Amino acid sequence: MSGSAVSKRYASALFDIAVETSQINEIEEELTVLKEVFRNEAGLQEVLSHPKVSAAKKKELIQQSFGALSESVLHTIFLLIDRRRSSIVPDLTDEFIKLANQARQTEDAVVYSVKPLSEAEMLSLSQVFAKKAGIASLRIRNEVQTDLIGGIKVRIGNRIYDGSVSGKLERMERQLAGGNR
């Protein structure tokens, strides 16, 4: 079974538990933190995948490092350790977030701007682009990109709405280059 299929199965099972226990948001937050740690700490993944380190030692390491995790997440990580699949935690997290967003009828979006946006600006953008995307709401994260010159660029899933000055200049350049042929 492919890694993504396995991640989907574990994410789906964990999501079912999250729904039953009304802990979707809490589990999503915990998984997001775990994902960052797994991605940024190569040593952790090395230890968890090392064949000479016993499963009990690996679980003890997780328990000591992430003792504040909910029982559901902790048991899922332990199960992944037992089945030698701890490397799928980042993919499992992504799949869990997709399921949670579907249940909430929301999506995550990144708004790139030249300067940080205010809460009011982000709320307004959330409402406008939620309508465009045909969903109930957007959870917006703002990233500053000074190379945009002005305007904004919004990424929702794999869709990009580019209203930046640099994007407009690039489109004009392509049109002019295409017209000279």
UniProtKB/Swiss-Prot annotation:
Against NCBIfam families, the record matches this protein to:
ATP_synt_delta, PRK05758.2-4
Membrane topology, from the record: Peripheral membrane protein
Explain the purpose of this protein.
F(1)F(0) ATP synthase produces ATP from ADP in the presence of a proton or sodium gradient. F-type ATPases consist of two structural domains, F(1) containing the extramembraneous catalytic core and F(0) containing the membrane proton channel, linked together by a central stalk and a peripheral stalk. During catalysis, ATP synthesis in the catalytic domain of F(1) is coupled via a rotary mechanism of the central stalk subunits to proton translocation. This protein is part of the stalk that links CF(0) to CF(1). It either transmits conformational changes from CF(0) to CF(1) or is implicated in proton conduction.
Which UniProt key words apply to this protein?
Answer: ATP synthesis, Cell membrane, CF(1), Hydrogen ion transport, Ion transport, Membrane, Transport
GO MF annotations in UniProt: proton-transporting ATP synthase activity, rotational mechanism
Q: Which SUPFAM superfamilies match?
A: N-terminal domain of the delta subunit of the F1F0-ATP synthase
Where does it sit, as one GO cellular component term? plasma membrane
Q: Where in the cell is it found?
A: Cell membrane
Record PROSITE patterns = ATPASE_DELTA
Q: Give the multimer and partner information.
A: F-type ATPases have 2 components, F(1) - the catalytic core - and F(0) - the membrane proton channel. F(1) has five subunits: alpha(3), beta(3), gamma(1), delta(1), epsilon(1). F(0) has three main subunits: a(1), b(2) and c(10-14). The alpha and beta chains form an alternating ring which encloses part of the gamma chain. F(1) is attached to F(0) by a central stalk formed by the gamma and epsilon chains, while a peripheral stalk is formed by the delta and b chains.
The name under which this protein is listed is: ATP synthase subunit delta
InterPro entries in the record: ATP_synth_OSCP/delta_N_sf (IPR026015), ATPase_OSCP/d_CS (IPR020781), ATPase_OSCP/dsu (IPR000711)
Q: What family is this protein classified in?
A: Belongs to the ATPase delta chain family.
Q: Which domain of life is it from?
A: Bacteria
